[in-house]
Amino acid sequence: LWMPKLLGRKIVVTVHGLDWQRAKWGNFASFVIKFGEKMAAKYADEVIVLSENVRQYFADTYQRQVTYIPNGISRPVPKEANLITEKYGLVKDGYFLFLARIVPEKGLHYLIEAFRQIETDKKLVIAGGSSQAMEYMEKIHRMAAEDTRIIMTDFVQGQMLEELYSNAYTFVLPSDVEGMALTLLEAMSYGNCCL
C-alpha cells in the first residue's frame, strides 16, 4: 500500500468483508488484517465495498466514505431435476440446500443440529468442499452420518449446481460472518426462499 503511494500511483482497495472477525484467524492474524483495513481506510484513494453493512462500518469506524458496488450475477434459466434425481434421488422442493465452503464461520454445524431436531421428509443437501479446515470437515461428516436425510455432495458445478439451485425447497446459509455471499445471491436469482 505504501510503495505505490510513494511512487504517486492511485490505490483502489476492494473489501469483501470484515475478515478479521472470522474465527479461523488467531489474535495475531486478526490484528494484522485489522491493521491492513485501517491502512486501506486511511491511504487508499478509493475503497470499494460489496455490502451496505460494510459501507456503514467504514463510515462509522473510519469516517470514510466508500463506494458500494454489490456482487453481480446472471439471471439463470431454471433446470429440471434430472442429474440430481439420478445421482441423489432428489426431487423438486424435496430438500433444503446449503452451498458454501465447509468452514466453521459458515455455521453448518448449527444447521445440522437444527435439522436433526425437526420432523420432515425433506432432505438436507450439503454442497461444498473444505478450505483448509479438515478437522471441521471431519466433524461435519460425522454429524451428517447420524441422519440418513442428510446428503453431502462435495463440490458441485455446471448442470448439477444449476439443478440443485433450481429445485431446492429453501436455501440456507447460517453464517456467523459474511460480506455478501455470492451463493446467497445465486440462490435468490433462482427464486429460492432463503434463510
Regions found by a protein language model. Give the residues of each.
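Aromatic "clamp/platform" in nucleotide-sugar-dependent glycosyltransferases that forms part
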Residues: 176
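Membrane-proximal helix-turn-helix segments that form the acceptor-binding/catalytic region
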Residues: 6, 30-46
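Nucleotide-activated donor-binding/catalytic signature segment of Leloir-type glycosyltransferases, i.e.
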Residues: 137-156
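A conserved mid-protein helix/loop that constitutes part of the nucleotide-sugar donor-binding site
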Residues: 94, 98, 103-117, 135
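Short alpha-helical donor nucleotide-sugar binding micro-motif in glycosyltransferases
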Residues: 155-156, 163-168
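A short hydrophobic beta-strand element within the catalytic core of glycosyltransferases
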Residues: 171-172, 194-195
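A short helix/loop element that forms part of the nucleotide-sugar donor recognition site in Leloir-type
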Residues: 78-90
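Carbohydrate-associated surface elements
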Residues: 53, 72
